[in-house]
Amino acid sequence: VEMALALADQVPQLALFCGEPLLAGHCAGLRMRAWGHLRMRRVQVREHCPISRIDGNCLISGEASVWRGNRLLLASGAQALPWIAASGLSCDGDGFVHTAPTLQSHSHPQVFAVGDCASLPGVRKSGLYSMRQVPVLAANLSAALRGGALRDYKTHGQRPLLLASGDGGALLGWHQWSAGGQLYGRCKDYFDR
């Protein structure tokens, strides 16, 4: 959504394909605000349209061609790399490394995994959560090398989601609350730095 809104004024025809509902898992208010911004910026949105393959200059969903064009920017959600599952590390059903709160692999405690390659209950695959794991990862790598005690990464419940709206503002979603505007854009800019 952020990428589509950022590109909307620079790309004459822009389409966003979602395998599930737009911003699935987030509050209805945030989804409605995002839909409004996308419509206002003339971004075509296709929900429940997972892209199964790219054939030449066509996007295919199932067996149907759903888009044809010369320029494609593909942004998928987090996907486990095939080598991870083939490595012998314990993985979840999607191929992400099972990790303990110490960020160690359950099957190979000498291996640490964070971010989009790791599966830690209660932690979304998002840059925000990955960045919050870094201090614990750094401390634990140092402790492991010294033979010291490891710290647990603690999830802090649902954090607010800020999506850049492409106009200097941002959309906020938190639990069942949503808002939008320039103030939230300044907050997002501050947090991203």
Language-model segments: residues:
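C-terminal, flexible cofactor-proximal segment of oxidoreductases
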Residues: 124, 133-193
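FAD-site-proximal beta/loop scaffold in flavoenzymes
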Residues: 67-135, 139, 143
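A Rossmann-like FAD-binding core segment of flavoenzymes
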Residues: 11-101
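Cofactor-binding loop segments of dinucleotide-utilizing enzymes, especially the Rossmann-like FAD-
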Residues: 19, 116, 165-167
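Conserved beta-strand scaffold positions in the cores of enzyme catalytic domains, especially
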Residues: 45, 111-113, 162
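Rossmann-like NAD(P)H-binding beta-loop-alpha module
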Residues: 1-13
